Amino acid sequence: QLEKDKVDIIHTIGGDDTNTMAAALAEYLHSSGKALTVVGLPKTVDNDVIPVKQTLGALTAAEQGALFFQNIVNENTTSRRQLIIHEVMGRHCGWLTAGTALEYRKLLGRKNFIPELFMSKDRWDIHAVYIPEIQIDFSKEVKRLRKIMDEHDCVNIFLSEGAGMD
């Protein structure tokens, strides 16, 4: 169909799968004696395309993840001793988790807190951010987080889906 429609260039906007498939298609056509140029624009929430500093979609995903967590962390006002784990995409790359944590901290800085209603900054803050690029000493973290739980009645964790897998 590409040949019939005289398509000789494809512009892709997407992540690994989109651009890998377009490149494979171009390679297949090249092996058949046909030319296809692929121009790929990276769009990935992982923000892990080198040398691109900021991929389309990454900052928006971080901002939306922060807003989502702002709604979820409100559960800390409903009862005591809450553990909230906000799992964020990022099997091999922690950029989105770290970016989401950063955006959430910006939101947190604009809040007013009422400690009498369990709305202290300590209860809404992030107590741990785990990403694949950093080793986790689980025994130390358990002790540290238990102390936070005892002091603040809650622990809030941002977890990249690939963290601690090694």
What are these model-derived regions, one by one?
Residues 8, 16, 46-48, 63, ...:
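Acidic side chains
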Residues 16-18, 43-46, 90-93:
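Short acidic/polar capping segments at secondary-structure boundaries
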Residues 1-9, 13, 37-46, 162-166:
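A cross-family phosphate/adenosyl-ligand binding-site feature
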Residues 12-13, 22-24, 28-35, 55-166:
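Accessory alpha-helical/coil subdomains and C-terminal extensions
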